[in-house]
Amino acid sequence: VTPGRHHVVAGVLVRGATVLLGHRSPDRRWCPDVWDLPGGHVEPGEDEPAALARELQEEVGVVPRDPVLLTRFEGDELVLSLWVVRAWDGEPRNRQPHEHDALRWVGAADLSGLRLAHPAYVEVVHRLVEFGNAAPPGE
């Protein structure tokens, strides 16, 4: 965890050629009324995989198996780490309707019509769909 910056993890749950997005409720303080990946803040003393597992369990009721770090965005106030999750225990469902008012499996073609929390999500989903369920080259 980087002092002075918000440290956030998000899970990119991949099912076929789609990823799971949650629509943030319009009354949320941060990033209201946009589509976002499930995840949240890393707590003090917690590593990213533990934070990811906790947040995915809290928000969508799944326990990730073998998540892989995809990318990390670092800004002055925020560190955002995206983890690819291709396997999990449980069936995704909205466990925090006060945070997300809807969940949806979204393909790359569907992204252009959605307001996204982070513009990089478009590239992330396109890359994942391009690789399909195969590991990136070199793995």
Stretches with model-predicted labels:
Residues 18-58:
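Conserved Nudix-box catalytic region and its N-terminal flanking loop in Nudix hydrolases
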Residues 14-19, 26-28, 43, 76-77, ...:
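Short, charged/polar surface micro-motifs in flexible loops or helix N-caps
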Residues 1-20:
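Conserved N-terminal beta-strand and adjoining loop/helix that marks the start
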Residues 71-93, 102-109, 124-129:
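Active-site-adjacent beta-strand/loop module that shapes the phosphate/pyrophosphate-binding cleft
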Residues 111-114:
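C-terminal structural segments of small proteins and small subunits
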Residues 62-72:
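A short coil-to-beta-strand element that immediately follows conserved catalytic motifs
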Residues 117-139:
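Charged phosphate-binding loop/patch that engages nucleotide di/tri-phosphates or the phosphate backbone
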Residues 8, 31, 76, 98-100:
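A short beta-loop-beta micro-motif enriched in histidine and acidic residues
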